[in-house]
From Swiss-Prot:
Organism: Homo sapiens
Encoding gene (name): TBC1D19
Stated name of the protein: TBC1 domain family member 19
Role noted for this protein: May act as a GTPase-activating protein for Rab family protein(s).
Sorted UniProt keywords: GTPase activation
GO molecular function, one term: GTPase activator activity
Top-level taxon: Eukaryota
Stored PANTHER family: TBC1 DOMAIN FAMILY MEMBER 19
InterPro entries: Rab-GAP-TBC_dom, Rab-GAP_TBC_sf, TBC1D19
High-level lineage: Eukaryota, Metazoa, Chordata, Craniata, Vertebrata
Bridged cysteine pairs (disulfide): none
Key word Lipoprotein present: no
């Protein structure tokens, strides 16, 4: 009990400290001072009167949403004496593996720099700045020669690192478990089984109305949808983040989705947010970074060739180029197992006082990175709002998909959860695929690392991301990956090679997400 109270007071202190540096804090302060002029504020009951004023004027709700938003990304409380690196990742071998992986990425980036004889960063000449500013809204028409640039890494390279991950303190001895024999992921992490997942995703139950399911026997779909829209409008009118998060677990109506996601992520486009975005844009105009070419190359290789997303090419460049300059992203490294890469001012290699984070946001884009942004372009058409939503989605969720950690939503746990679900509930299929050299994870990894973006039809992907936001968890990605294998099990049992298995699972664009999840979670015999 005492420990819980101490944890709570520590969390409160840290959130208060974080909010003190925010724009909301100064707005609340200004409102409090302004309220002193009001006749209903009495000196003898000053504290209570100001609280009441905040409640009536809606500022209390804004403060609640800000606190709720901080709690959503806040790491679990650790021992007060624990060093800061424990907050990033408690397991030493995971931290070491992440550190080694980062060195490989940086080496790859630096060797590209040397091979192509180009600097990591340079100031653009005035003429080039003007040219970029003029074509800012039509960068997709640009055709720079990117043939010499290559992605720093692709998901399959990252998978090999995860496959070789081992806990040096863990000795299985002779009693090898079923999972250790069959799975590619060989680290002992606790993952949920289906009964625990049912409990976690209870709102996805067969007898609960869902958007994304057309054949409910209990209630006619249009009746449920009309009622769900009405409740959604009420949630938006209340401007309550927690209520919006609970509501969206049953899916979001298309017309309300953009506002609901913004409410859950606590994004409200203030003039200062637009100004901040414009400052980032100015940084892009003034300086050319090597990662800009990696971003161009990635968009050209992925989104530009996608039937759904090619129309958003200009938006993707704008958002990702600004993202690479955004130093506010660095704050998420406090609870991310990764650390931002460093570079040194020319001629000062190794001198820490001349070290700078590169790129400025600390995130080196990899092959497929632009697909985290692409689906959001369907919801937000104003660049600064689109940018804010993506940045918040990244620091809450997406960073976990390309860093090595023991977090339940981290990619290692998702891979292990996927393999465990298949091995436990579809053992014949799993064993068959393993025997023919088609380990299921080799096929599903690319889906999970991209959060299924670029694989599902957009309406289905947005329904899936509704649930990621609703449950504040990425575990549903592993469940869906297992559900896809279960759905195609009959065909997969007939294949005799990895290529044939990949062909069976090549096109997911016709799949309906919610029926697959429901059947796998609630109709599987456990």
């Amino acid at each position: 009990m005492l420990q819980e109270e101490s944890d709570l007071s520590l969390i409160i202190a840290q959130i208060v400290q974080k909010l003190k540096g925010s724009n909301l804090y100064s707005q609340l302060e200004r409102q409090a001072w302004a309220s002193l002029q009001r006749p209903e504020i009495k000196l003898e009951s000053l504290k209570e009167d100001i609280k009441e004023f905040f409640k009536i004027s809606g500022w209390e709700k804004k403060l609640q949403n800000a606190v709720y938003s901080e709690l959503s990304v806040f790491p679990l409380p650790s021992h007060p004496a624990a060093p800061p690196e424990h907050l990033k990742e408690p397991l030493v071998y995971m931290r070491k593996a992440q550190g080694s992986w980062e060195k490989r990425i940086l080496k790859s980036l630096n060797s590209m720099c040397t091979e192509l004889s180009i600097p990591l960063a340079r100031k653009r000449p005035v003429g080039e700045q003007k040219e970029l500013l003029n074509k800012w809204n039509e960068m997709g028409t640009d055709e720079p020669d990117l043939s010499l640039f290559r992605p720093v890494y692709a998901p399959k390279d990252f998978l090999e690192v995860l496959i070789n991950l081992r806990n040096p303190n863990y000795e299985n001895g002779d009693s090898l478990s079923f999972r250790t024999h069959l799975g590619l992921i060989q680290v002992p992490l606790k993952v949920k089984d289906i009964p625990e997942l049912k409990e976690c995703f209870v709102e996805l139950g067969l007898n609960i109305g869902q958007l994304g399911i057309d054949d409910s026997t209990q209630v006619p779909p249009e009746l449920f949808e009309n009622e769900h829209v009405r409740i959604g409008q009420k949630v938006l009118a209340e401007q309550d983040s927690a209520a919006a998060q609970q509501y969206i677990r049953q899916g979001s109506p298309t017309a309300l989705r953009a506002e609901l996601w913004a409410l859950i992520l606590n994004i409200s486009s203030q003039p200062e947010d637009v100004l901040y975005y414009e400052q980032l844009k100015t940084n892009v105009i003034q300086h050319d970074l090597l990662v800009d070419s990696l971003i161009y190359k990635d968009v050209k290789l992925t989104a530009s060739n996608d039937d759904y997303y090619f129309v958003f090419e200009d938006y993707l460049y704008q958002v990702l180029l600004c993202f690479s300059r955004d130093t506010s992203v660095l704050s998420h490294f406090a609870f991310n197992s990764a650390s931002p890469p460093k570079s040194y001012i020319r001629g000062k290699l190794g001198l820490e006082e001349y070290a700078v984070f590169y790129p400025p946001n600390g995130v080196i884009p990899f092959h497929g990175f632009s697909m985290y942004v692409a689906p959001l372009c369907f919801l937000y058409h104003e660049p600064s709002k689109l940018y804010q939503i993506f940045r918040e989605m990244y620091v809450r969720f997406f960073f976990r998909l390309h860093s090595i950690s023991s977090h339940p939503s981290g990619i290692v746990s998702l891979c292990l959860l996927f393999e465990t679900l298949l091995q436990t509930y579809l053992p014949q299929l799993f064993y068959h695929l393993r025997e023919i050299g088609a380990q299921p994870l080799r096929i599903s990894f690319k889906w999970m690392v991209r959060a299924f973006s670029g694989y599902l039809a957009t309406d289905q992907l947005l329904l899936l991301w509704d649930r990621i936001l609703g449950y504040n968890s990425l575990e549903i990605l592993a469940v869906l990956a297992a559900a896809v294998f279960a759905f195609r099990a009959v065909n997969l049992m007939e294949v005799t090679s990895l290529a044939a298995a990949e062909a069976v699972l090549a096109d997911l664009s016709t799949l309906k997400v919610m029926p697959l999840l429901q059947i796998f979670l609630f109709a599987t015999v456990t």
